[in-house]
């Protein structure tokens, strides 16, 4: 597909282009976060974090679980996407440094292949943002409409204010 063809895509396709990365990264992070926050998952991860030398393990497991859960929900909704993407990049950098980096690239051998893919998606969202089909965009559009309505009445408000100033 040529660059010319990509630039001629309908606006809805351009707007929808960031949905698959947001939804895939978000759902993955939600699942990983919930796994750390469930009782049996927390206990398993506490033992694992202690083996890695991350102490105190329980607070770090809970913080990681909450971070992954919130980052996932944010990515899915397209709200606070850039901070969520940054949080994913940090968690994946730690996962690569502490767990997967020494095992090479191949994910079947415990390598960092999957973490690198998640990091690439997160980096794209960090740079590009959530796109037009997002809660952030909807809230921004709502705020822009509200501001336009406010500005439309501004001259009348000024006249009323001047009248009140004259009346004392």
Q: How would you label these PLM feature ranges?
A:
Residues 69:
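Conserved short histidine dyad/triad with adjacent acidic residue
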Residues 1-35, 58-66, 77-168:
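Extended, low-polarity transmembrane helix blocks
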Residues 2, 38-56:
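Membrane-interface interhelical connector segments
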Residues 72:
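Conformational-control "hinges and anchors"
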